[in-house]
Regions:
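Amphipathic alpha-helical coiled-coil scaffold segments and their short linker/junction regions
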Residues: 37-41, 93-101, 195, 199, ...
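Bacterial Sec-pathway N-terminal export signals of envelope proteins
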Residues: 21-77, 83-85, 112, 236, ...
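Periplasmic alpha-helical coiled-coil/stalk elements that build and connect Gram-negative outer-membrane
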Residues: 150-263, 371, 375, 416-417, ...
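A glycine-/polar-enriched beta->alpha junction
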Residues: 38-48, 55-71, 115-132, 142-149, ...
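Bacterial N-terminal signal peptides
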Residues: 6-15
Length: 446
C-alpha cells in the first residue's frame, strides 16, 4: 500500500520534477541543425546505402573506361608435348627444335613462352557501354542527393518537433502554475464568504487537469528527444540541447526563386533524365551487336625450345609478332535482335517515368509552396491569438477578483490561452517542415 502511494505521488509530481531535471541534468554540447544533419548522415542506413550505390557506380564507370584502353599482360607458359618415335630409333627426341611431336599444334617437345602482350579491342559497343556507365553514375549521384534531401527533411521535422515538444512542456507548466494560483484565490474568496464552494471544486478540477496535461507533455517531449537521438547518437537516450528556437522564423523565398531553383536543381528530374540517357545508350550498345569488332594484338618476348634470350647456336630468341582480327557477326539465333527489343522497351519506360516525374514536380511545387505560404501567414495570426488570449485571461482574472466574473469565465480564458500557445508551437513546426519539404525540390538545404 505504501509503495502504491509513493508511485502515485511520483506520477503527480512527475511533470514539474521532469522539467526541473531537464533544466538541471548535465547535457552534451548544444547541437545546431547543421550538426544534427551531419551526425544523421553518419548513422542513417538508408543514406549510407545511397552513398554506397553512388561509390559503386563511380567505380563501374572506371571499369567501363578501362575496357576502352589497351590491356597489357606478361604471359609466361611452358608446354611439354610427347615426342614422336623415329623409325629405326626407339628413343624419342626431347630437346631439338626439329623434334617431331605428336600434336601438330605445338612446335616442339619443350616450348617456353615469356611474352608481353598488348591487346586492344575496337568496337562501338564498348564506347556505348562506357557512356552508359557514365549516365548510371550520374543517376546514382542524383539518387544520393534525393536520399540526402529526404534525410535533411526528416531531421528538420524531428529537430523542430523536439523544440515544439519542449515549448508545449513550458506551456503546460505555466498553465499549471496559473491553475494553482487561481485555486488559491478561490479558496481565499470562499474563506471570506465571497464565492460558493463550487468555485473551489471547479478550480481544483482545473488544476488536476493541468497536472495531467503536464505529465503528457513531458512524456511527449521525452519521446520526441529519443526519436531525434536515434539519428544523432549511438545511445538515443543521450542528453542534449538544441541551439535553435521557434521565435525567429526564416523567410519564405519568392515563388519565382523557387521555380528557377526547382527547374535547375531538382534531383528527381535529374535522376530520371540520367536513367533515360542510360536506357538510350543501352539501345545503342545492343545495336552495335550487328557491327564487327576489331581486335589488335602485339606480342614481344620468346617462344622457343629454351628459356633463354639466345638459342644454343647463338641466334636471338627475342622477337615480336602482331595480329589483327575482325569478327563479323553472321548468325546468333536472334539474340542481338532480342537484346535490342529489350533495351527499347526499357527506354520507353524510362521516358514515361521522366514525364511523370516532371508532372509530379510541378504539382508538388505548387502544393508545398502554398503550404509554406499559408503556414507563414497563420504564424502572424497565431501570435495575435496568443496575445489576445493572454490579455483576455488577465482581464477575466481582474473581473473575478472584483466579484464581477464567474469561475467558468476564468477557466475558459485559461483554456483559450493554453490552446493558443500550443497552436503557435505546432504552427511553427508546420512552417519549418513545409519549408524543408519545399527545399527538397529546390536544393537550398542546410
Amino acid at each position: 500500500m505504501f509503495r502504491n502511494l509513493c508511485l502515485f505521488a511520483l506520477v503527480i509530481a512527475g511533470g514539474s520534477s521532469a522539467v526541473n531535471a531537464q533544466a538541471n541534468a548535465p547535457s552534451s554540447a548544444p547541437i545546431s541543425l547543421e550538426e544534427a544533419i551531419r551526425r544523421a548522415q553518419t548513422i542513417e542506413t538508408t543514406y549510407s546505402a545511397a552513398v554506397t550505390e553512388s561509390v559503386v557506380a563511380q567505380a563501374q564507370r572506371g571499369i567501363a573506361r578501362s575496357a576502352l584502353l589497351p590491356g597489357v599482360v606478361f604471359h609466361n607458359q611452358f608446354l611439354y608435348t610427347q615426342g614422336q618415335s623415329i623409325p629405326g630409333d626407339q628413343t624419342p627426341s626431347h630437346g631439338g627444335s626439329t623434334s617431331s611431336v605428336r600434336f601438330i599444334a605445338n612446335n616442339t617437345v619443350h616450348e617456353y613462352l615469356s611474352q608481353g602482350i598488348v591487346t586492344e579491342t575496337i568496337g562501338g559497343a564498348g564506347i556505348a557501354d562506357y557512356r552508359r556507365a557514365d549516365a548510371e553514375a550520374a543517376a546514382a549521384k542524383a539518387r544520393l542527393e534525393i536520399s540526402r534531401r529526404g534525410l535533411v527533411s526528416t531531421v528538420v521535422g524531428d529537430y523542430y518537433g523536439v523544440l515544439a515538444a519542449d515549448a508545449n512542456v513550458a506551456v503546460a507548466n505555466r498553465a499549471l502554475v496559473e491553475a494553482k494560483r487561481f485555486g488559491k484565490i478561490t479558496r481565499q474568496r470562499e474563506a471570506g464568504g465571497e464565492v460558493a464552494h463550487a468555485d473551489v471544486v471547479r478550480a481544483d478540477l482545473q488544476e488536476q487537469q493541468r497536472q495531467r496535461e503536464l505529465n503528457d507533455a513531458v512524456l511527449a517531449a521525452r519521446k520526441a528527444r529519443v526519436d531525434l537521438g536515434v539519428l544523432l547518437f549511438p545511445d538515443p537516450t543521450t542528453a542534449y540541447t538544441l541551439t535553435v528556437g521557434l521565435d525567429q522564423l526564416p523567410p519564405l523565398p519568392s515563388r519565382a526563386e523557387i521555380d528557377v531553383a526547382a527547374k535547375s536543381n531538382n534531383p528527381d528530374v535529374r535522376a530520371a533524365f540520367e536513367v533515360l540517357r542510360s536506357a538510350d545508350l543501352e539501345v545503342t550498345s545492343a545495336r552495335f551487336g550487328y557491327v564487327p569488332d576489331l581486335s589488335l594484338n602485339y606480342y614481344y618476348g620468346i617462344d622457343a625450345p629454351q628459356f633463354a634470350i639466345h638459342a644454343p647456336d647463338g641466334s636471338r630468341n627475342l622477337g615480336y609478332a602482331a595480329s589483327a582480327t575482325l569478327d563479323i557477326p553472321v548468325w546468333d539465333w536472334f539474340a542481338t535482335r532480342n537484346r535490342v527489343k529489350q533495351s527499347t522497351i526499357r527506354r520507353t519506360q524510362a521516358k514515361a517515368e521522366l514525364t511523370i516525374t516532371q508532372r509530379r514536380l510541378l504539382a508538388s511545387l505548387d502544393e508545398l509552396y502554398q503550404e509554406a505560404s499559408v503556414s507563414q501567414t497563420q504564424m502572424a495570426l497565431l501570435d495575435q491569438s496568443v496575445q489576445t488570449a493572454r490579455e483576455s485571461l488577465n482581464l477575466t482574472n481582474l473581473r473575478y477578483s472584483a466579484g464581477e466574473g464567474s469561475v467558468l469565465e476564468v477557466v475558459d480564458s485559461q483554456n483559450s490561452l493554453v490552446s493558443a500557445e500550443v497552436s503557435r508551437a505546432d504552427g511553427a513546426v508546420r512552417y519549418y517542415v513545409a519549408l524543408a519539404n519545399l527545399q527538397t525540390l529546390t536544393g537550398n538545404m542546410p
